[in-house]
Swiss-Prot record:
This is Cyclic pyranopterin monophosphate synthase. NCBIfam families: moaC, PRK09364.1. GO terms for molecular function: cyclic pyranopterin monophosphate synthase activity. Substrate binds at L75, C76, H77, M113, E114. Homohexamer; trimer of dimers. The gene is moaC. SUPFAM superfamilies: Molybdenum cofactor biosynthesis protein C, MoaC.
Amino acid sequence: MPELTHFNTAGDAHMVDVGGKPSTTRMAVAEGYIAMLPETLRLIMAGGHEKGDVLGIARIAGIMGAKRTADLIPLCHPIPITHVDLALEPQPEASRIRCRTTVQTVGQTGVEMEALTATQIALLTIYDMCKAVDRGMSIESVRLLEKIGGKSGHWQRASGEARSSTR
């Protein structure tokens, strides 16, 4: 089993030194869902929310979250993000919204945390904007789907796979 990289030999938390790693193109894709009452989803899709365009605001919040990941997660490196694509897809048949985020950079470390953070922030923004009408919403299945670049190369979650070991 691989060792945890954020601890030194004394067991103290530290930021991993990526200074000697080459800069490569890196990409990560994450997804997550927010389940809600059908009436809440209809309100969002109709654009009738008094706070404004829920999905548009959530998209911008998620992009901002990707850019601020190093400020939120203590041992993350600040990364020059080159692209964020955040798509919010209403799924009326399941009474939920899917968030899928792709983040890219050219750098010495990956953007998995940025993709996961962007996804969470977008979903949290939907919750915040709609909690007055539906406090029972549930953020679910936030996970990494794919990462490309770096020493570990390409990793992709197997279809239907809920959990994965490092490969």
